[in-house]
From Swiss-Prot:
Negative regulator of class I heat shock genes (grpE-dnaK-dnaJ and groELS operons). Prevents heat-shock induction of these operons. One of its GO terms (biological process) is negative regulation of DNA-templated transcription. HAMAP family: HrcA. The gene is hrcA. Pfam families: HrcA. The keyword Transcription regulation applies. Keywords: Repressor, Stress response, Transcription, Transcription regulation. GO terms for molecular function: DNA binding. This is Heat-inducible transcription repressor HrcA. InterPro entries: GAF-like_dom_sf, HrcA, HrcA_C, WH-like_DNA-bd_sf, WH_DNA-bd_sf.
């Protein structure tokens, strides 16, 4: 991403702010009148042409004005937005959080509804629980170089893992590992299996042909614990989508609705963002929606009971990133602090 001059960055920011407020192409005449009284229309047009050439703006075919491109939004999110003055948000959210006799889940739900009202966009709230219990591991040979491991949980969920092997000795090692796992860790919570890995490694070391292969290809790949968390998803404010001009087309709206309903998308997003302590912005091309004017702002709230709560605001790429980032970050900070106080100052989980 190429760095812009100070003036180019200011022009890009003004165009995006204007387009966020009023979703119509922005021209040099408006910029001169509203934002840059000291610059001529010619200068602005030249700078806008440079921004368009570099891919930060694009031209609407029915207007001489420009609109932001996805690259422009990425630059805006990364370099041009700062945390809003959060004092007012903190005050209002704290009033929600300090309501007596409310559980953490209830407080998060109230916070989500507050965000709905503030941005007029839907919010996807996904709860991740670590209570899944392993009941059985099955092995299926697919061909001479690939096997499928099935991990079955007590709730009936089946997690599939494909394991590659180069020869019969490695396949025999896989069978040995499956027998050991079924003997040693059945009826163990997935989140507790890590505590048994050192013992398992010592048992496996004396039983297999290629110990390092087992470690690299089986243990590390098989027990990816984030994937075993139960996910419970709720969507709040879905009706707000119909208010966005970008989603007026029925086919486009249907694709966005399908995105909201796809739990795996939100699980994957949480897994990718698990070490991110702030707000993450994901654009449509990363969500399987190439060419769509959609983006997602998300954050993870960690609580001391090993649960996680992902909040994701879904909207057009022209959403007010400064506002949504401030809302999500403030809610995350306030709830994690409140949860820590409830549990005697224990640090919230960040895994």
């Amino acid at each position: 991403m190429k760095n812009l001059t100070t003036r180019q960055a200011q022009i890009l920011k003004a165009i995006i702010n204007e387009y966020i407020a009023y979703p119509v192409p922005v021209g040099s005449k408006l910029l001169t009148k509203k934002y840059f009284k000291n610059l001529s229309g010619g200068t602005l047009r030249n700078e806008m042409a440079v921004l368009e050439k570099e891919g930060y703006l694009k031209k609407n075919h029915i207007s001489s004005g420009r609109i932001p491109s996805q690259l422009g939004y990425q630059y805006y999110v990364k370099l041009l937005t700062k945390n809003d003055d959060k004092s007012n948000l903190k005050t209002r959210l704290r009033a929600i959080i300090l309501q007596k006799h409310k559980t953490i889940d209830e407080i998060i739900e109230l916070g989500v509804k507050f965000i709905n009202e503030m941005v007029n966009l839907p919010v996807v709230l996904t709860h991740f629980s670590s209570d899944e219990v392993l009941k059985k591991i099955d092995l299926i040979m697919l061909d001479q170089s690939c096997a499928l491991l099935l991990l079955v949980s007590a709730s009936g969920n089946v997690f599939k893992k494909t394991i590659s092997y180069a020869n019969q000795r490695q396949f025999e090692d896989i069978m040995v590992c499956v027998r050991i796992f079924n003997d040693r860790i059945i009826d163990t919570r997935f989140c507790d299996i890590a505590q048994h890995l050192d013992v398992l490694k010592e048992i496996i070391r004396s039983k297999v042909h290629e110990y390092q292969y087992v470690i690299d290809e089986i243990l590390f790949k098989l027990f990816n614990f984030e994937e075993f968390q139960q996910a419970r998803k709720q969507v709040y404010g879905i009706h707000y989508l119909a208010q966005q001009p970008e989603f007026a087309n029925q086919e486009r709206l249907t694709r966005i609705l399908n995105l909201l309903e796809d739990t795996s998308v939100w699980q994957q997003m949480a897994f990718m963002n698990q070490n991110n302590q702030t707000t993450n912005i994901t654009f449509g091309d990363k969500l399987g929606l190439e060419g769509e004017e959609v983006s997602v702002a998300s954050t993870l709230i960690n609580t001391t009971n090993e649960s996680k709560h992902q909040l994701a605001i879904v909207g057009p790429t022209r959403m007010d990133y400064q506002k949504v980032k401030a809302l999500l970050l403030t809610l995350k900070e306030e709830i994690e602090e409140y949860d820590k106080q409830l549990h005697g100052g224990k640090t919230t989980s960040s895994t």
